[in-house]
Protein backbone atom coordinates (compact mmCIF):
# COMPACT_ATOMS: atom_id res chain seq x y z
CA UNK A 1 0.00 0.00 0.00
CA UNK A 2 1.30 3.44 -0.93
CA UNK A 3 0.13 6.45 1.05
CA UNK A 4 0.61 10.05 -0.03
CA UNK A 5 -0.47 13.13 1.92
CA UNK A 6 -1.46 16.50 0.46
CA UNK A 7 -2.47 19.36 2.76
CA UNK A 8 -5.22 18.04 5.04
CA UNK A 9 -6.24 15.19 2.75
CA UNK A 10 -5.19 11.58 3.09
CA UNK A 11 -5.00 9.84 -0.27
CA UNK A 12 -4.75 6.07 -0.02
CA UNK A 13 -3.58 4.41 -3.22
CA UNK A 14 -4.16 0.68 -3.34
CA UNK A 15 -4.05 -2.00 -5.96
CA UNK A 16 -7.36 -3.46 -7.04
CA UNK A 17 -6.78 -6.54 -4.89
CA UNK A 18 -6.06 -4.54 -1.74
CA UNK A 19 -8.95 -2.19 -2.36
CA UNK A 20 -11.30 -5.16 -2.51
CA UNK A 21 -10.07 -6.15 0.95
CA UNK A 22 -10.62 -2.69 2.46
CA UNK A 23 -13.62 -1.63 0.38
CA UNK A 24 -16.37 -3.06 2.67
CA UNK A 25 -14.99 -1.21 5.67
CA UNK A 26 -14.27 2.04 3.84
CA UNK A 27 -17.68 2.18 2.18
CA UNK A 28 -19.45 1.08 5.36
CA UNK A 29 -17.95 4.06 7.13
CA UNK A 30 -19.59 6.33 4.58
CA UNK A 31 -16.31 7.40 2.98
CA UNK A 32 -16.68 8.08 -0.74
CA UNK A 33 -14.14 6.84 -3.23
CA UNK A 34 -13.28 7.74 -6.79
CA UNK A 35 -11.52 5.67 -9.40
CA UNK A 36 -8.47 6.95 -11.21
CA UNK A 37 -5.66 5.41 -13.19
CA UNK A 38 -2.07 6.15 -14.03
CA UNK A 39 -0.05 4.73 -11.13
CA UNK A 40 0.67 1.78 -13.38
CA UNK A 41 -0.96 0.60 -16.55
CA UNK A 42 -2.18 -2.57 -14.85
CA UNK A 43 -3.07 -0.99 -11.51
CA UNK A 44 -6.20 0.92 -10.53
CA UNK A 45 -5.84 3.80 -8.11
CA UNK A 46 -8.51 4.68 -5.54
CA UNK A 47 -7.78 7.99 -3.77
CA UNK A 48 -9.93 8.49 -0.68
CA UNK A 49 -10.18 12.27 -0.36
CA UNK A 50 -10.82 12.58 3.33
CA UNK A 51 -8.78 13.39 6.40
CA UNK A 52 -9.69 10.12 8.13
CA UNK A 53 -9.60 10.45 11.92
CA UNK A 54 -10.01 7.54 14.31
CA UNK A 55 -10.51 7.93 18.05
CA UNK A 56 -9.04 5.57 20.63
CA UNK A 57 -9.27 5.41 24.40
CA UNK A 58 -5.82 5.84 25.87
CA UNK A 59 -2.49 7.22 24.76
CA UNK A 60 -0.57 6.99 21.50
CA UNK A 61 1.51 3.83 21.62
CA UNK A 62 -1.20 1.84 23.40
CA UNK A 63 -2.68 -1.46 22.27
CA UNK A 64 -5.68 0.46 20.94
CA UNK A 65 -3.27 2.53 18.83
CA UNK A 66 -1.66 -0.66 17.54
CA UNK A 67 -5.07 -2.15 16.71
CA UNK A 68 -6.17 0.99 14.88
CA UNK A 69 -2.99 0.84 12.80
CA UNK A 70 -3.93 -2.66 11.69
CA UNK A 71 -7.52 -1.73 10.87
CA UNK A 72 -7.05 1.72 9.30
CA UNK A 73 -3.30 2.19 8.76
CA UNK A 74 -3.53 5.58 7.01
CA UNK A 75 -5.83 7.25 9.53
CA UNK A 76 -4.88 9.96 12.00
CA UNK A 77 -5.32 8.63 15.53
CA UNK A 78 -7.05 10.85 18.09
CA UNK A 79 -6.30 9.72 21.68
CA UNK A 80 -9.04 10.23 24.28
CA UNK A 81 -8.76 10.16 28.05
CA UNK A 82 -12.15 8.52 28.64
CA UNK A 83 -14.21 5.92 26.82
CA UNK A 84 -17.25 8.21 26.85
CA UNK A 85 -15.18 10.84 25.00
CA UNK A 86 -14.46 8.30 22.25
CA UNK A 87 -18.17 7.76 21.69
CA UNK A 88 -18.87 11.50 21.99
CA UNK A 89 -16.41 12.19 19.17
CA UNK A 90 -17.94 9.55 16.91
CA UNK A 91 -21.49 10.77 17.52
CA UNK A 92 -20.43 14.41 17.19
CA UNK A 93 -18.63 13.83 13.90
CA UNK A 94 -15.19 15.13 14.90
CA UNK A 95 -13.83 11.67 13.97
CA UNK A 96 -15.05 9.29 11.29
CA UNK A 97 -14.59 6.15 13.39
CA UNK A 98 -13.21 4.73 16.62
CA UNK A 99 -11.38 1.58 17.66
CA UNK A 100 -12.33 0.17 21.06
CA UNK A 101 -11.29 -2.95 23.00
CA UNK A 102 -14.34 -5.05 23.80
CA UNK A 103 -12.92 -8.18 25.44
CA UNK A 104 -9.67 -9.87 26.37
CA UNK A 105 -9.20 -13.62 26.17
CA UNK A 106 -7.92 -13.69 29.78
CA UNK A 107 -9.39 -10.67 31.58
CA UNK A 108 -12.83 -10.88 29.98
CA UNK A 109 -15.13 -8.16 28.71
CA UNK A 110 -14.74 -4.39 28.91
CA UNK A 111 -18.05 -3.71 30.66
CA UNK A 112 -18.14 0.04 30.02
CA UNK A 113 -17.82 -0.44 26.28
CA UNK A 114 -20.71 -2.90 26.16
CA UNK A 115 -22.85 -0.36 28.03
CA UNK A 116 -21.85 2.41 25.62
CA UNK A 117 -22.55 0.28 22.55
CA UNK A 118 -26.04 -0.32 23.88
CA UNK A 119 -26.87 3.32 24.63
CA UNK A 120 -25.00 5.28 21.93
CA UNK A 121 -25.84 5.75 18.25
CA UNK A 122 -22.88 3.86 16.80
CA UNK A 123 -22.53 0.71 14.71
CA UNK A 124 -19.85 -2.00 14.56
CA UNK A 125 -18.21 -2.47 11.14
CA UNK A 126 -15.23 -4.67 11.80
CA UNK A 127 -13.46 -6.70 14.48
CA UNK A 128 -9.77 -7.43 14.94
CA UNK A 129 -7.92 -9.75 17.32
CA UNK A 130 -4.63 -8.33 18.56
CA UNK A 131 -2.02 -10.58 20.15
CA UNK A 132 -1.07 -8.89 23.42
CA UNK A 133 2.68 -8.67 24.03
CA UNK A 134 3.77 -7.00 27.24
CA UNK A 135 7.27 -5.49 27.29
CA UNK A 136 9.36 -4.07 30.12
CA UNK A 137 10.40 -0.57 29.04
CA UNK A 138 12.73 1.90 30.77
CA UNK A 139 14.56 5.09 29.87
CA UNK A 140 17.78 4.51 27.88
CA UNK A 141 20.75 3.56 30.05
CA UNK A 142 18.75 2.06 32.92
CA UNK A 143 19.65 -1.55 33.80
CA UNK A 144 17.24 -4.21 35.03
CA UNK A 145 18.99 -4.49 38.41
CA UNK A 146 18.26 -0.80 39.07
CA UNK A 147 14.50 -1.20 38.68
CA UNK A 148 12.49 -1.03 41.92
CA UNK A 149 9.02 -0.16 40.61
CA UNK A 150 7.07 -0.93 37.45
CA UNK A 151 4.13 1.17 36.27
CA UNK A 152 1.31 -0.10 34.07
CA UNK A 153 -2.42 -0.61 33.72
CA UNK A 154 -3.73 -3.01 36.42
CA UNK A 155 -4.73 -5.62 33.81
CA UNK A 156 -1.24 -5.60 32.29
CA UNK A 157 0.36 -5.95 35.72
CA UNK A 158 -1.91 -8.88 36.52
CA UNK A 159 -0.96 -10.59 33.26
CA UNK A 160 2.76 -10.47 34.16
CA UNK A 161 2.68 -12.20 37.56
CA UNK A 162 5.56 -14.55 36.75
CA UNK A 163 7.85 -11.58 36.15
CA UNK A 164 7.04 -10.08 39.55
CA UNK A 165 7.43 -13.44 41.30
CA UNK A 166 10.90 -13.82 39.79
CA UNK A 167 11.81 -10.22 40.73
CA UNK A 168 10.45 -9.86 44.30
CA UNK A 169 12.22 -6.54 44.93
CA UNK A 170 10.28 -4.86 42.13
CA UNK A 171 6.97 -3.29 43.14
CA UNK A 172 3.98 -3.19 40.78
CA UNK A 173 2.44 0.30 40.58
CA UNK A 174 -1.02 0.59 38.95
CA UNK A 175 -1.26 3.37 36.35
CA UNK A 176 -4.10 4.59 34.13
CA UNK A 177 -2.64 3.38 30.81
CA UNK A 178 0.09 1.10 29.48
CA UNK A 179 1.55 3.58 27.01
CA UNK A 180 0.90 6.41 29.46
CA UNK A 181 3.15 4.67 31.97
CA UNK A 182 6.02 4.79 29.46
CA UNK A 183 5.41 8.47 28.82
CA UNK A 184 5.44 9.04 32.60
CA UNK A 185 8.77 7.36 33.36
CA UNK A 186 10.46 9.02 30.37
CA UNK A 187 9.08 12.49 31.15
CA UNK A 188 10.05 12.21 34.82
CA UNK A 189 13.43 10.61 34.01
CA UNK A 190 12.85 7.85 36.57
CA UNK A 191 16.04 5.79 36.84
CA UNK A 192 14.60 3.26 39.29
CA UNK A 193 11.40 2.59 37.36
CA UNK A 194 10.13 0.84 34.27
CA UNK A 195 6.79 0.36 32.54
CA UNK A 196 4.93 -2.57 31.03
CA UNK A 197 3.54 -1.61 27.65
CA UNK A 198 3.47 -2.42 23.92
CA UNK A 199 6.77 -2.18 22.06
CA UNK A 200 5.27 0.68 20.05
CA UNK A 201 5.16 2.82 23.20
CA UNK A 202 8.96 2.68 23.54
CA UNK A 203 9.38 4.21 20.10
CA UNK A 204 6.59 6.70 20.70
CA UNK A 205 8.12 8.21 23.85
CA UNK A 206 11.84 7.44 23.65
CA UNK A 207 12.01 4.44 25.96
CA UNK A 208 14.03 1.25 25.54
CA UNK A 209 12.79 -2.32 25.79
CA UNK A 210 14.64 -4.13 28.59
CA UNK A 211 12.71 -7.40 28.36
CA UNK A 212 10.37 -8.39 25.54
CA UNK A 213 7.15 -10.38 25.86
CA UNK A 214 7.04 -10.90 29.62
CA UNK A 215 3.34 -11.82 29.66
CA UNK A 216 2.43 -15.05 31.47
CA UNK A 217 0.26 -16.46 28.70
CA UNK A 218 1.16 -16.20 25.03
CA UNK A 219 -2.43 -17.04 24.09
CA UNK A 220 -3.40 -13.53 25.13
CA UNK A 221 -5.62 -11.70 22.66
CA UNK A 222 -7.80 -8.61 22.80
CA UNK A 223 -10.75 -8.24 20.48
CA UNK A 224 -11.14 -4.72 19.10
CA UNK A 225 -14.14 -3.25 17.29
CA UNK A 226 -14.22 -0.56 14.62
CA UNK A 227 -17.29 1.64 15.11
CA UNK A 228 -18.83 4.63 13.35
CA UNK A 229 -22.16 6.44 13.03
CA UNK A 230 -22.90 4.89 9.65
CA UNK A 231 -25.14 1.83 9.65
CA UNK A 232 -24.25 0.71 6.15
CA UNK A 233 -23.38 -2.99 6.02
CA UNK A 234 -20.30 -3.84 3.99
CA UNK A 235 -19.75 -6.84 1.77
CA UNK A 236 -18.58 -10.04 3.43
CA UNK A 237 -20.43 -9.35 6.68
CA UNK A 238 -21.08 -12.72 8.32
CA UNK A 239 -21.34 -11.86 12.01
CA UNK A 240 -23.96 -9.90 13.93
CA UNK A 241 -23.78 -8.45 17.46
CA UNK A 242 -27.05 -7.94 19.32
CA UNK A 243 -28.15 -6.57 22.68
CA UNK A 244 -31.56 -7.45 24.11
CA UNK A 245 -33.59 -7.27 27.32
CA UNK A 246 -36.06 -10.03 28.19
CA UNK A 247 -39.33 -10.02 30.07
CA UNK A 248 -39.17 -11.62 33.52
CA UNK A 249 -41.24 -14.73 32.79
CA UNK A 250 -40.41 -18.46 33.07
CA UNK A 251 -38.50 -19.97 30.16
CA UNK A 252 -37.97 -16.70 28.35
CA UNK A 253 -34.20 -17.15 27.86
CA UNK A 254 -34.80 -20.60 26.38
CA UNK A 255 -37.32 -19.09 23.98
CA UNK A 256 -34.95 -16.26 23.05
CA UNK A 257 -32.10 -18.61 22.20
CA UNK A 258 -34.45 -20.94 20.36
CA UNK A 259 -35.04 -18.31 17.66
CA UNK A 260 -31.43 -18.91 16.61
CA UNK A 261 -31.29 -22.67 17.20
CA UNK A 262 -34.42 -23.32 15.13
CA UNK A 263 -32.72 -21.66 12.16
CA UNK A 264 -29.33 -23.37 12.64
CA UNK A 265 -27.70 -20.06 13.55
CA UNK A 266 -24.58 -20.52 15.65
CA UNK A 267 -23.82 -18.27 18.64
CA UNK A 268 -20.15 -17.41 19.20
CA UNK A 269 -20.80 -15.39 22.37
CA UNK A 270 -23.47 -14.81 24.99
CA UNK A 271 -23.07 -12.61 28.05
CA UNK A 272 -25.36 -10.85 30.48
CA UNK A 273 -24.75 -7.47 32.09
CA UNK A 274 -26.71 -5.45 34.66
CA UNK A 275 -29.12 -3.04 32.97
CA UNK A 276 -28.21 0.46 34.13
CA UNK A 277 -31.03 2.22 35.95
CA UNK A 278 -32.93 -1.03 36.50
CA UNK A 279 -31.55 -2.95 39.51
CA UNK A 280 -31.61 -6.75 39.13
CA UNK A 281 -32.58 -6.56 35.49
CA UNK A 282 -30.12 -7.68 32.83
CA UNK A 283 -29.24 -7.11 29.20
CA UNK A 284 -27.96 -10.00 27.09
CA UNK A 285 -25.24 -9.53 24.50
CA UNK A 286 -25.07 -12.14 21.76
CA UNK A 287 -22.86 -12.62 18.71
CA UNK A 288 -24.29 -14.79 15.94
CA UNK A 289 -22.32 -16.15 13.02
CA UNK A 290 -24.65 -14.86 10.33
CA UNK A 291 -24.80 -11.61 8.42
CA UNK A 292 -27.78 -9.71 7.07
CA UNK A 293 -29.58 -12.65 5.45
CA UNK A 294 -33.13 -13.98 5.53
CA UNK A 295 -32.51 -16.42 8.37
CA UNK A 296 -30.99 -13.79 10.66
CA UNK A 297 -33.68 -11.23 9.82
CA UNK A 298 -36.41 -13.76 10.63
CA UNK A 299 -34.65 -14.71 13.86
CA UNK A 300 -34.46 -11.07 14.93
CA UNK A 301 -38.12 -10.47 14.12
CA UNK A 302 -38.97 -13.52 16.22
CA UNK A 303 -36.73 -12.25 19.04
CA UNK A 304 -38.54 -8.89 19.02
CA UNK A 305 -41.79 -10.73 19.78
CA UNK A 306 -40.22 -12.23 22.91
CA UNK A 307 -37.95 -9.44 24.16
CA UNK A 308 -38.75 -6.05 25.65
CA UNK A 309 -35.88 -4.42 23.77
CA UNK A 310 -33.62 -5.46 20.88
CA UNK A 311 -30.73 -3.50 19.35
CA UNK A 312 -28.48 -4.60 16.51
CA UNK A 313 -25.02 -3.40 17.52
CA UNK A 314 -23.31 -4.23 14.25
CA UNK A 315 -23.07 -6.52 11.22
CA UNK A 316 -19.51 -7.16 10.05
CA UNK A 317 -16.99 -9.75 8.80
CA UNK A 318 -15.85 -12.24 11.44
CA UNK A 319 -12.12 -12.14 12.15
CA UNK A 320 -9.80 -14.98 13.12
CA UNK A 321 -7.89 -14.83 16.40
CA UNK A 322 -5.09 -17.13 15.28
Which residues does each PLM region occupy?
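Serine residues within intrinsically disordered or low-complexity segments
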Residues: 4-8, 20, 33, 37
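Low-complexity, intrinsically disordered Ser/Thr/Pro- and acidic-rich segments
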Residues: 16, 27-33
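Serine/threonine-rich, low-complexity intrinsically disordered segments
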Residues: 14-17, 37-38, 45
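Domain-level signature for soluble enzymes in the chorismate/prephenate branch of the shikimate pathway
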Residues: 28, 41-322
Amino acid sequence: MKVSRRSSDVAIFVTLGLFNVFRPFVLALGVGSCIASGVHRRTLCYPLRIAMKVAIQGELGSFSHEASGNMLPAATVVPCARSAEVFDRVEGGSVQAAVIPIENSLAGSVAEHFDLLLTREVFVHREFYLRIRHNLIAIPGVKLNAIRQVFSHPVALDQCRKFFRSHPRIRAVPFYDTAGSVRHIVAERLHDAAAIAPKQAAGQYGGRVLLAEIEDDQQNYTRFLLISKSKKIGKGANKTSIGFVLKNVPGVLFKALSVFALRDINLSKIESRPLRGHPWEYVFFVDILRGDDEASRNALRHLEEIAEFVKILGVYPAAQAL
